[in-house]
Amino acid sequence: MTHDNKLQVEAIKRGTVIDHIPAQIGFKLLTLFKLTETDQRITIGLNLPSGEMGRKDLIKIENTFLTDEQVNQLSLYAPDATVNRIDDYEVVGKSRPNLPERIDTVLVCPNSNCISHAEPVSSSFAVKKREKDIALKCKYCEKEFSHYVVLAN
């Protein structure tokens, strides 16, 4: 193997690889999706060189597979991500996130008066695609926000 072809992040035998995450978003995904709440090994590549993106992040989670719902929820943060299923060091499935109709438990409502902050309820947002933006409407306070506002929260 030449120096140019060397893997920058170690291969995994079985699990999930989330590739083409925009740079600086990898840690946010780990936190929001609670991906670190596992005993499985997680490998993270940050600011890796990418021909398409310039720089990208990468997450590899051994012996763990994301559900379709989890893959689709990635679309707000990493709409061009590729989620690869790995078995015996081979890619056995590839998927890309699609914008879901609803996102539950992952995001926090930016409305400080929203009941979701004081009550033991999981957040829930309806997702609406706009011309140049994505709107998220909180199930509890019914306020609508640009996804940029919710993501920055």
From Swiss-Prot:
Keyword Zinc: yes
GO molecular function, one term: metal ion binding
Assigned GO CC terms: aspartate carbamoyltransferase complex
Record has Metal-binding as a keyword: yes
Keyword field: Metal-binding, Pyrimidine biosynthesis, Zinc
An annotated GO BP: 'de novo' pyrimidine nucleobase biosynthetic process
Gene3D superfamilies listed in its UniProt record: Aspartate carbamoyltransferase regulatory subunit, C-terminal domain, Aspartate carbamoyltransferase regulatory subunit, N-terminal domain
Cofactor(s) needed by this chain: Zn(2+)
Domain of life assignment: Bacteria
Amino-acid positions noted as binding Zn(2+) in the UniProt annotation, renumbered to this chain: C109, C114, C138, C141
Cofactor annotation comment: Binds 1 zinc ion per subunit.
Any Pfam family matching the protein: PyrI
Function field: Involved in allosteric regulation of aspartate carbamoyltransferase.
Family listed: Belongs to the PyrI family.
Subunit and interaction comment: Contains catalytic and regulatory chains.
PANTHER family referenced in this protein's UniProt entry, alphabetically: ASPARTATE CARBAMOYLTRANSFERASE REGULATORY CHAIN
HAMAP family tied to this protein: Asp_carb_tr_reg
Name assigned to this protein: Aspartate carbamoyltransferase regulatory chain
